[in-house]
Amino acid sequence: MEILVFMDSYGLSTQLSMETLHGSLTDPAISSMNLLNELIDEYPVAISMAAGRPYEEFFDVRLIHEYIDAYCDHLRHDRKLAEAVVTRTLFQYGTTKGIIADLIARNLAEDENIDAAAESVVVTVGAQEAMFLILRTLRADERDVLLAPAPTYVGLTGAALLTDTPVWPVQSTANGVDPEDLVLQLKRADEQGKRVRACYVTPNFANPTGTSMDLPARHRLLEVAEANGILLLEDNAYGLFGSERLPSLKSLDRSGNVVYIGSFAKTGMPGARVGYVVADQRVAGGGLLADQLSKLKGMLTVNTSPIAQAVIAGKLLLNDFSLTKANAREIAIYQRNLQLTLSELERTLGGLPEVGWNTPTGGFFVTVTVPFVVDDELLAHAARDHGVLFTPMHHFYGGKDGFNQLRLSISLLTPELIKEGVTRLAALITARLRWPRA
């Protein structure tokens, strides 16, 4: 056990060890992304099909100024604010719930057919803060557990670890989270004296699998939630990026079971770090759930940067509150990249019956299945000897499953890099298939 000894200003020693720090720091989910970053730094010429970052070609610093100017004009002309108030809005601390909740509500009505009152919106520092606030609020005592599909987004797993919230897995299928297994897990929790507070779900092009739920499955999931009195935490980061649009759970919800988590990282600007949560549920004696989330946010980040909010607001204002309109070029590129990735997988690996992959109709991710172990050792070998990076799927299972799958991200690369990246991946897989079986 390594112990670090520090001397404080009084000459007293302070001993620190991992055993005396929060247990989440040694969990594989917390450290999984560090490995990818280390490999990217160590092998800079390797083509990364690991990072789920948005396309960069259209980034332009001038847009930041245009967006802020548009928001300031909105404050002056639409809201009739004096110049001193406009200046204060950007430079001072802002309200905890955010300064653009009304504009987000208009965007939700325009793009998602969601009727959200501004007071039910809390603007957060990315969707990650929204997840933390929700789980911290719902985790009241040792009985409380969260359900989530297996595999699931590591950010959700991380938020659960930081809030000491146990996560119970729900089976996933090619049609997304399985509502019938959700029923079984609810029954199991009841038998064990546990209280399921919510089920996390990404109905559209889930990270990491790329799968989506069809319309009947969405209705069934809402039925299960209503019948059992649980919340559904709907994460819709990739909903715009498909060949067809299905209604969000929130737009279908008639019983108040859906808490909607949104992010502008993929549709607005990742560097702004602006997300939000729509929590319009009533809390007995406490107003809206959004009000309770706001209390915690006030002690965590105080408020989301008003300047960052102004950037996002300007983009909404200049695109008639439609991120579908604002992302028309990006949507086309992601569709192109996805179809190219699938066709390249077929070209390079289609003759190998033991290798397969799913065929999402949108989003950023494709899942490849192979008949051998995909672990961090193989990832390092791929970077070093084949010049390609991917994400081993076991990271999204907490290291407990998924050892024969990998995730490819199609969002950031050019067509040329996709072709070369898949070619390198195919060379790795073909070579690995020749290794002697254990």
From Swiss-Prot:
Its EC number is 2.6.1.103. One of its GO terms (molecular function) is transaminase activity. Pathway: Antibiotic biosynthesis; vancomycin biosynthesis. Keywords: Aminotransferase, Antibiotic biosynthesis, Pyridoxal phosphate, Transferase. The modification N6-(pyridoxal phosphate)lysine is found at residue 266. Its cofactor is pyridoxal 5'-phosphate. It catalyses: (S)-3,5-dihydroxyphenylglycine + 2-oxoglutarate = 2-(3,5-dihydroxyphenyl)-2-oxoacetate + L-glutamate. One of its GO terms (biological process) is alpha-amino acid metabolic process. Catalyzes the transamination of p-hydroxybenzoylformate to L-p-hydroxyphenylglycine as part of the biosynthesis of the (S)-3,5-dihydroxyphenylglycine constituent of the glycopeptide antibiotic chloroeremomycin, a member of the vancomycin group of antibiotics. Belongs to the class-I pyridoxal-phosphate-dependent aminotransferase family. This is (S)-3,5-dihydroxyphenylglycine transaminase. The lineage of its organism: Bacteria, Bacillati, Actinomycetota, Actinomycetes, Pseudonocardiales.
